[in-house]
Structures are given as structure tokens and as C-alpha cells.
Amino acid sequence: TKTVEGINVGKDMYELMKEIVLPKELSVGEGYGTVEWAIRSIFEGYTGWFRHNSTTELYSYSPKSIFPELNDLIDKEMALKMVKDLIEKNEYLKAIHISEIIISSDNNKEALKMYLKIHQILLKESQKNSNRWIVKWLEFEIEKTKNKLNEEADSTT
């Protein structure tokens, strides 16, 4: 009901995902799913997939498709410093977004290292709630990033 109440007063999905928590007496753990995912599912079930945020949502155009162009526009050193600062402020998800832009067209080694570090931190933190999906995804991303770093090292030798 909290999700529907939020929808009815105009809150967006991400806002509700941050705000809503289960009362302790209803919490049974999040080993298979999360409260955030349930909120997202309810939100999209009621409102549909179109979030009214951008015209591009109506077309088959991935937001990530512009990452290479953004990467060409940015100062890499400033962007890498921003990622490092975000990590230090524990703003890991923002740091992932910026890292993905930097990595999108040239697999920047420093950005890959920071991307790896972020995922390792998130994996360590996720062990507390032991959500299987999150743990497995983070392990997958860590392995994939290590492989990219190893490929980069192999190509320079």
C-alpha cells in the first residue's frame, strides 16, 4: 500500500525504493529478492514501463548508447578524480555510472581498476544481507572486469 500511496502523490519509483522499509515484524530476509525490487515491480505493474522521464524511453534506444560520445567529450583525468572522490564518499552507484562512461569506448585501465574496486566493496557489503542475485551479479562483474584488466595487460606485453 505504501508504494501505491506514493504513486498517488506523484513520487517516482527511485524515491519510493529509498523511502519504503518493511516493519521488523514482517522482515524475513532478502536472500532471493529485495524490498526495493518488490517496490519497483509494484510501481511498474501499476504505472507501466513508461516512466515519463524522457522521449527516448518510447524508442529502442539504450541510454548507454551515448556513452562513447560522452567519453569523447570529457576530460579523463577529471572524470577519474570524480570517480575516486565518489568512492571515498561511499557514493558507489554514481561512481559506477561515471566509470561505465569512461570504460565505454577505450577500457581505460584506471577506470577499470576503480570499477573493480567498487564492485569488490559492494560485494563485501552485500554479504551482510546475502541476497543471492546481488552476490552472484557482483561476482560476475568482478570476474569480467578482472578478465578485461588481464586482457589489457596481455596486449601490452
Q: Where in the sequence are the language-model features?
A:
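Accessory terminal helices/loops
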Residues: 1-157
